[in-house]
């Protein structure tokens, strides 16, 4: 019985690790399409980013795609990395992934650094096809460093 629990934990962390690596890749490549694939399809995602972006609102996954397309058109990522190897456990079936995002304005080369928090939740698929639901972004918050 303990081995089943351990296997479940290892599988959960493995899937979570794949998600966090995909988030890192989306930011490094300034790729709103990849980020869009990681956003929850169940409801709206809350996004709150301080200056220089200065935005806070709930939006659909499609709106988030267009929002990040505009962000990546204005700013270029030059550093994005996780603050810790494992995400912080928020509650059952959800985690907070904390990362440092450094980016610069493409027009004037002003550099900015934010601490970004991604709330990740397990999203149940509509059918019974996937035994382990994927981790999806339900919230993105940031604060200046």
Where are these regions (language model features)?
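Sec-exported extracytoplasmic/periplasmic mature domains
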Residues: 28, 32, 40, 44, ...
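Second-shell loop/turn segments in exported
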Residues: 22-25, 50-57
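Short, solvent-exposed secondary-structure junction/capping segments
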Residues: 39-53
């Amino acid at each position: 019985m303990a081995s089943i629990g351990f296997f479940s934990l290892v599988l959960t962390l493995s899937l979570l690790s794949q998600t966090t690596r995909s988030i890192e890749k989306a930011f490094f490549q300034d790729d709103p399409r990849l980020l869009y694939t990681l956003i929850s399809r169940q409801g709206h995602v809350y996004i709150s980013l301080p200056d220089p972006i200065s935005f806070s609102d709930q939006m659909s996954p499609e709106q988030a795609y267009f929002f990040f397309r505009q962000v990546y058109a204005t700013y270029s990522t030059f550093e994005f990395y996780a603050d810790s190897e494992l995400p912080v456990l928020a509650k059952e079936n959800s985690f907070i992934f904390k990362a440092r995002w450094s980016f610069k304005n493409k027009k004037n080369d002003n550099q900015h650094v934010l601490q970004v928090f991604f709330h990740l939740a397990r999203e149940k698929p509509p059918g019974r096809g996937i035994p382990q639901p994927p981790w999806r972004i339900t919230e993105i918050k940031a604060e200046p460093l």
